A protein has these predicted regions:
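Juxtamembrane loop-helix boundary motifs flanking transmembrane segments in multi-pass membrane proteins
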Residues: 1-4, 56, 118, 122
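Hydrophobic transmembrane alpha-helices
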Residues: 1-53
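Membrane-embedded alpha-helical hairpins and interfacial helices in multi-pass inner-membrane proteins
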Residues: 27-32, 60-188, 199-200
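Small-polar-interrupted transmembrane alpha-helices in polytopic inner-membrane proteins
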Residues: 18, 55-63
Length: 202
């Protein structure tokens, strides 16, 4: 139960940060030429899978309030799929940064194509790709690595989807006296994490 609460809370926090950044930087966060700083958060699934829900919700709300319905559809899909692929590629050496670059560059320009704009798709592809390289690689990547190291040193717990979804069953067993809750609720750090779970943060 505690893990599930943490999981949901962190998702909400990530969504709020994404929306706040998009709101504060609204003039440069939307349109064919954009610099959406909040997209740097899409790398968080590398060590925080709950942020997949957070960045997707944050992107949806940002596009819903400040952009067109086409952006709500294509932009949110691009961010959601990119976040999932980033999580799946979390064990690779920086390859997890590729999905946000490619998916946003491929899907976001479709907004203006479907909207009837005469803007060239390839031109928008290049512009979005360039902005994603700056936001994701030059800003998001170092921030993500630094944040992960800082949270690990602080003893902040990281959970996989499997662990978060299993939390209700663990809580039920604890209340029945069938499981010891000390190890379940113990903060996970690099020093005390079980060997089998260390790979989830690699």
């Amino acid at each position: 139960m505690k893990r599930t609460v943490f999981f949901i809370t962190r998702s909400a926090v990530v969504a709020a940060i994404y929306f706040a950044l998009a709101t504060a930087l609204q003039p440069i966060s939307f349109g064919p030429v954009q610099f959406r700083l909040s997209e740097a958060l899409v790398l968080l699934p590398v060590f925080m899978p709950e942020s997949i829900i957070g960045v997707t919700l944050g992107c949806f709300l940002s596009n819903f309030f400040y952009s067109t319905m086409y952006d709500v559809i294509f932009g949110t899909i691009a961010t959601a799929v990119a976040a999932v692929l980033t999580y799946l590629l979390r064990r690779t050496k920086f390859l997890y940064a590729l999905p946000p670059l490619l998916l946003n560059a491929l899907l976001v320009p479709l907004i203006w194509v479907v909207d009837g704009s005469d803007a060239a798709y390839l031109l928008n592809f290049a512009l979005i790709l360039a902005s994603e390289v700056i936001v994701v690689c030059l800003i998001g990547l170092p921030v993500t690595l630094a944040l992960r190291k800082a949270l690990t040193r602080a003893g902040i717990q990281f959970y996989t989807f499997r662990k978060a979804l299993a939390a209700p069953a663990y809580f039920r067993d604890v209340t029945r006296g069938e499981r010891d809750d000390e190890t379940f609720f113990r903060p996970r750090t690099e020093q005390n994490a079980p060997k089998g779970e260390e790979n989830d943060r690699a």
